[in-house]
Amino acid sequence: MKRTYQPHNTPRKRTHGFLVRMKTKNGRKVINARRAKGRKKLSV
């Protein structure tokens, strides 16, 4: 049986990347929340 997680960088970036987050209001909310929390990595 094939495992469910088959990592690839392109789809990863396209769905969870910084630029994608910045596109929508809610995405920006996510980035700001992570900034406020002091996360080292804001996005993928």
Curated annotation (Swiss-Prot):
One of its GO terms (cellular component) is ribonucleoprotein complex. Keywords: Ribonucleoprotein, Ribosomal protein. One of its GO terms (biological process) is translation. GO terms for molecular function: structural constituent of ribosome. The keyword Ribosomal protein applies. Belongs to the bacterial ribosomal protein bL34 family. This is Large ribosomal subunit protein bL34. It comes from Helicobacter pylori (strain ATCC 700392 / 26695).
